[in-house]
Amino acid sequence: MTALILLLAYLLGSIPFGLLVGKIGYGIDIREHGSGNLGGTNTFRVLGAKAGTIVIVGDMLKGTLAASLPMLFSVPVHPLLAGAIAVVGHMYPVFAKFRGGKAVATSGGVMLFYSPLFFLSLIAVFLVVLAVSRYVSLSSMAAALYAVVYTVFFTDDIPLTVAVLLLASFIFYRHRANIQRILNKTEPKVKWPGKRS
């Protein structure tokens, strides 16, 4: 049963909401537009706020639902393990030729299930950095770095610390190209309403 739960978590994570929303709602393959990424940020840029929001919420719910599977089926699997497996599915989805997202929203969904207050603090860090920098990628990495610092130095929850270290490493690894573009000052910025650049 443990293996079945982990397989189900991976399959949940593999649901490519960006691909589904693009093809069903707009008749396009989101992987062929913008950055080519299946995540919510690229969907926002290519298809707009409505589609982007749907994808982000869907990607988050994958993590939340996957983390809840052990409880729902009364299986002795740690929710953070099931959630981490879903994040792997999100990054390397079997339903989308293993070309997936950058682990941010699904990781957030895992944290939402495990510790809602911690999740809210992550959102706060993300929004503050986004307001200052206008870089979604930098804001995501800043939230991941905050999560690492907080769990390593300010909590005794070992499973959470291990999970955060793993998920943060996923996030930084998947943002390698973004880091280079930030350094080169070619990374796209969020355009606030009323702002020209």
UniProtKB/Swiss-Prot annotation:
Keywords: Cell membrane, Lipid biosynthesis, Lipid metabolism, Membrane, Phospholipid biosynthesis, Phospholipid metabolism, Transferase, Transmembrane, Transmembrane helix. One of its GO terms (cellular component) is plasma membrane. This is Glycerol-3-phosphate acyltransferase. Probably interacts with PlsX. Belongs to the PlsY family. It is a multi-pass membrane protein. It catalyses: an acyl phosphate + sn-glycerol 3-phosphate = a 1-acyl-sn-glycero-3-phosphate + phosphate. Catalyzes the transfer of an acyl group from acyl-phosphate (acyl-PO(4)) to glycerol-3-phosphate (G3P) to form lysophosphatidic acid (LPA). This enzyme utilizes acyl-phosphate as fatty acyl donor, but not acyl-CoA or acyl-ACP. Pathway: Lipid metabolism; phospholipid metabolism.
